[in-house]
Amino acid sequence: MVRCGCALLRKYGNFIDNLRIFTKGGSGGMGYPRLGGEGGRGGDVWVVAHKNMTLKQLKNKYPQKRFVAGGGANSRVSALQGSKGKDCEVPAPVGISVTDENGQVLGELNKEEDRVLVAKGGLGGKLHTNFLPLKGQKRIVHLDLKVIADVGLVGFPNAGKSSLLSRVSHATPVIADYAFTTLRPELGKIMYNDFKQISVADLPGLIEGAHMNKGMGHKFLKHLERTRQLLFVVDISGFQLSSVTPYRTAFETIILLTKELELYKEELQTKPALLAINKMDLPDAQVKLQELMKQLLSPEDFLHLFETKMIPEKALEFQHIVPISTVTGEGIAELKSCIRKALDEQDGKESDAHRSKQLLNLQSSS
């Protein structure tokens, strides 16, 4: 068990999803008191989104992780107004949340060329500074990557999430018959006949206690924050992490996964959710499916079997429940159709909400 944990840490270390950098705006230029000349303002430091950039590439390219903008030009006889210092741009991947040392969000990079100002340059010397320049702002900045996708796959290890991703998209994640095969987020796209594309993120499997960062839970759970919908993937035969951990039925895994999301961030429970019940090719799968459906239809009749701390405050209501087999392909086409339908419905609701908001703004301004 310890050996597995060490391997997980080593391999996951190759994928960087958080980077701490030092930034400093440029100092202002000297003023020219005799002629009233003003020094140029120091350059600013910006974090800018680049499509093909990764945090690992950023770290390798700038191992010191220091980004300092240029100083403003001094005022002189031939140029009384000093020119502004050169800005410094920090290239970062799309999907970055930029925060300071106190956790305050400075901005987000949701698409290519989005930019966030992280350190301002100092003022140039002028009358109210006695023509003395000011230093630029210093700031420690955290770049936190959160995968952006339409659908995020949620499940315990070895539930078949990677196999499902390879079935519904052209992604080629590592697939094996043991836990923790996926050690970093994998992205794939579902392609439809009308050229519609839906992005799907396969996240490393969660374990009980993920909300407390067990099994790197925080590294994994945070990637669900920017997905529009959740797709739970559950093994119909249940789950057991190891011989020393309790066996969980399919129903128990759903309850526990819901609780983990709730304890990490309650907002995750407000996301629309679907359920894929995997491994329907196994013996007795149909019998277990009938039992699971009965439990899902009336969960309150079975929650007394759980410890109080394991019961979520609010049970998730799945928009669609689809039995599948990633081995035989059973239910895959239906699942893709349900994913499309659920997202189309969500698009419609978001459009209606946007139109209502615009109408209210027009009414209040008239």
Swiss-Prot record:
Belongs to the TRAFAC class OBG-HflX-like GTPase superfamily. OBG GTPase family. This is GTP-binding protein 10. Its main location: nucleus. Keywords: GTP-binding, Nucleotide-binding, Nucleus, Ribosome biogenesis. The keyword Transport does not apply. SUPFAM superfamilies: Obg GTP-binding protein N-terminal domain, P-loop containing nucleoside triphosphate hydrolases. Residues 13-148 form the Obg domain. One of its GO terms (biological process) is ribosome biogenesis. GTP binds at residues 155-162, 202-206, 278-281. GO terms for molecular function: GTP binding; GTPase activity; magnesium ion binding. The keyword Metal-binding does not apply. Residues 346-355 have a biased composition (Basic and acidic residues). May be involved in the ribosome maturation process. It comes from the Eukaryota. Pfam families: GTP1_OBG, MMR_HSR1. Residues 149-344 form the OBG-type G domain. Residues 346-366 are annotated as: Disordered. PANTHER family: DEVELOPMENTALLY REGULATED GTP-BINDING PROTEIN-RELATED (PTHR11702), GTP-BINDING PROTEIN 10 (PTHR11702:SF43). The lineage of its organism: Eukaryota, Metazoa, Chordata, Craniata, Vertebrata. GO terms for cellular component: mitochondrion; nucleolus. It is found in: Nucleus, Nucleolus. Signal peptide: none annotated.
